[in-house]
Amino acid sequence: MRRNSPSIQLMHTYFFGGPITRTVKALIIVNIAVYVLQITAHLFGIQSIDWYFGLVPIRVTHELMLWQFVTYMFLHGGVIHIYINMLTLFMFGNELERFWGTRRFLSYYFITGIGAGICSWLVAINNSAVIIGASGAIYGLLLAYGMTYPNRIVYLNFLLPLKVKWMVLIMGGFAFLSSIAGSEPGVANIAHLGGMVVGYLFLKGNDWRDRYRQFNEHHRREQLKRQFEVYYGDVRRKVESDNKKGPTIH
């Protein structure tokens, strides 16, 4: 049996996020399968797959093609596009899924992806440009990783050591400035920024719900405590009153 050396195992665990998890693996397989179908359709001159399943704001607005908010996430604009997205999903998604659990991870992935699509639609309701790619969800994952492991070190371009929180701030700032400047034609920077904003609201919303739940639980315990004290006080006063009456002779 072939075994990896400890150094290789450590690199695999800490640099690449450890063994691939079930949901991350499934997402990568589905994305690659859809991309193969997409380029096969293009080879046969079928371009309607992008027009029908990509996010086309004007079609959502006037034809109510609401499924596009989900399906656009599985289409990509080229090998580099899908490679970067899937590599990022692999590197950062595994650890988040192990930490959160499958259900929360998958919910977060789709909520940030759909939220990014909605943001793109809102700023260009009557635009006929086709928006495709999982980048909104991927940027959401990067934000979540930065908030969960802010002081982890990553190597930017495999060379420059950088804390995750600074990497997320740089990428978020770049997406924000690009969305204002309208630079990089063909890149949906609003979707990138939208994925991060929706991800932040999702994570903070969970914090607020947890605090509200804790507050309610504390308030309920205090109410029960006061009710018990009142009941116990009544019982004690009754016992003291009965004792003052003296013994009952049968």
Predicted regions and their residues:
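Small-residue faces within membrane-embedded alpha-helices
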Residues: 113-117, 140, 144, 161
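Alpha-helical transmembrane bundle and helix-membrane interface signal
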Residues: 98, 148-161, 208-213
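N-terminal TM1-TM2 helical hairpin plus the immediately adjacent luminal interfacial "cap"
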Residues: 14-132, 177-203
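Generic transmembrane alpha-helix signature in multi-pass membrane proteins
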Residues: 142-143, 155-156, 171
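Alpha-helical membrane-embedding segments
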Residues: 79-93, 166-176, 225-234, 238
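Membrane-interface micro-motifs in multi-pass membrane enzymes
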Residues: 129-150, 164, 191
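C-terminal transmembrane module of polytopic alpha-helical membrane proteins
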Residues: 1-20, 175-250
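Cytoplasmic-side transmembrane-helix entry/capping segments in multi-pass membrane proteins
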Residues: 103-111, 132-137, 158-168
